[in-house]
A protein has these predicted regions:
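C-terminal effector modules of nucleic-acid-centric enzymes and ribosome-associated factors
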Residues: 1, 11, 137-291
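Generic detector of well-ordered alpha-helical segments enriched in charged/polar residues
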Residues: 6, 50-54, 270, 274, ...
Length: 291
């Protein structure tokens, strides 16, 4: 029966994109294979549930995972110190690394990595640090610091798998707060592509998501989000949806991909003004809107 259950479950999860699935036959009532190996299941050679939970690598570290750091706080106690505080979402950073601040695109070099226990030469995912830079760059809370040459996706329109958690349905067109890491913006569901039957994983047509529904939703937000797909980076691929009136979290989302955006057609005045600003005020860091 155990082998039949394994086979049935593997078939069910084929479409769920799981990298690693483990099975443990156990009895919660009798404690079999929960903490100690069960004498009643000599045919099972694997680990107990507790041993598996203590040894499994939930999020394996990868030396090549891109560095992502969302600024949570700008620390400026005096004119001689300006640091950007936050928790490293993924990857690692070294003193001397060249970074890019988003959305401005300005570059600098990491001068110091400051922690409560002293300065470091290197910091890794999950560590709370303050970064100081060689150059004075205007970076605010919610903006992102990444390494040069390894940029995230940037968009105002994206598709996400959404878990809806409120009694009031998710309605396309209704404005919500979208919290992506430390960045808060506003946005709305443009359309609901489908929702899932959680028992069969069948995609069903739907114009709304009710409480406990899971669905594929296209979003439009008012400010550019810098992200990696959730399957590649949970730290920058997740967001929460907050009701603007009650401030209650009503949903959670996992970004799958950016949507194709229509090329913005700028007027002659906008093009000329952009050229003038970049020519005469380069220190403003204005981007070339023709690219």
């Amino acid at each position: 029966r155990y082998q039949a259950i394994k086979k049935e479950y593997r078939e069910f999860t084929e479409s769920l994109d799981f990298d690693d699935i483990r099975f443990v036959p156990l009895s919660a009532l009798n404690g079999d294979n929960v903490v100690e190996e069960s004498e009643n299941m000599p045919w099972y050679p694997g680990a107990t549930l507790m041993k598996l939970l203590n040894t499994i690598d939930v999020e394996p570290q990868n030396e090549f995972t891109p560095f992502r750091f969302q600024v949570q706080y700008v620390n400026r106690p005096n004119l001689d110190f300006r640091g950007f505080a936050g928790t490293i979402a993924s990857g690692h950073i070294l003193v001397g690394d060249t970074i890019v601040a988003l959305p401005s695109g300005k570059e600098s070099v990491v001068k110091e990595i400051v922690t409560f226990d002293g300065n470091l030469e290197r910091a890794d995912k999950g560590m709370a640090v303050t970064l100081t830079l060689e150059d004075e760059i205007d970076i605010s809370r919610g903006e992102m610091i990444v390494k040069k040459g390894n940029l995230p996706h940037s968009t105002k329109e994206f598709n996400a798998t959404v878990v809806w958690m409120h009694e009031n349905e998710l309605e396309p067109g209704r404005e919500y707060f979208i919290k992506h890491g430390s960045k808060m913006t506003t946005g709305h569901a443009q359309s609901i592509e489908n929702k899932y039957d959680v028992n069969t994983m069948e995609k069903l047509s739907s114009s709304q998501l009710a409480v406990n529904d899971i669905g594929n939703v296209n979003f439009v937000v008012d400010e550019v989000l810098h992200f990696d797909p959730y399957k590649d980076n949970r730290g920058t691929g997740a967001f929460i949806i907050i009701d603007r009136l009650s401030n209650i979290t009503v949903g959670a989302g996992m970004i799958t991909h950016a949507l194709d955006q229509k090329t913005h057609e700028y007027s002659a005045f906008e093009l000329e003004f952009n050229t003038l600003v970049r020519k005469h005020f380069p220190h403003w860091g204005a981007r070339d809107i023709t690219k």
